[in-house]
Amino acid sequence: MKTLNTFFLIMFAVCFLSSKSYASTACAATSTAASHQGLSGSANYATNGDDGYCFHTPTSMKVTVYEFGLCTAASSPTSKTACTTIFNNTSGKTLDLGVGSSLPLSDSVSLTEGTYTHAYVVLSNVTSIKSVIQFSTARVDDTNNSGTYCYTDGRSVNDTPKPKSVMSCGSNGSNAAYAVETIGLGGNTYSNTYINYTVSMGGVNIVSNLYAITSSGALSSAGNDFALYGSQQLASAVNITPDTKGLDIAFSITDGVTLGFGINLGNGVAVGQTGPNDAVFEGLRFKITAR
């Protein structure tokens, strides 16, 4: 066993210029509903089962983390034998990824020397997203306000009745507020498992196995989701050797949200809205290096 000093940084990467987006998948100053249509099923497809979405780096994302670990193979809620848990808190720790906050990890962690290809996280299925995007020309929101800035305004897709939009537009983004979202895996049909969920974040394809679980850690059924268990293949494997002194562990939210244009959130689409009307959590990228 190798005892390491562990540094955990929740990293917010402002990375618009270095994001190697694919054709028509990244949100841009000129984006419209037409810019992100017709991509479904193609290699350049932006996101989550519907046309009309583009990748975006949010201003801030709040998540609650219950557990985090490093693994030598893919894991699941019922099979973590390949993993070493680095953080565990049954009450959870809420992190503001846009500001940069840290998990209270132990001073050291023991890892068996070898190659770690995966990591896992258990996080609440309720997230909060704050996003602001600036366009080159004025856009109109669902209440006929207009401006070159569009932003999440505090409404949620979980509201009753359903809103037509969770975003407003104006002359600046100072009124941006968090949009709360309860994450599901199955779209219109409930599912507690999503294998090989793939999303491009910062130009890197991130592959994860996702599971909806109960508070006891078992796979959930419709209506009793408590958290998400995500097993993610690392973009670069972590090698623990006799010379390894510690670990640097980070989350990146670059391209971690998608914005949608002309999306029916359950109450129709507002006539004349030219700005985005939806903001959706897409994922986190684990960035782990040995030193």
Task: Give the ranges of each region predicted by the language model.
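Bacterial N-terminal signal peptides that target proteins for export
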Residues: M1-F8
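Bacterial N-terminal signal peptides
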Residues: F8-F16
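Sec/Tat signal peptide C-region and signal peptidase I cleavage site
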Residues: L17-A23
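A short, solvent-exposed, low-complexity linear motif enriched for acidic/polar residues
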Residues: S24-R291
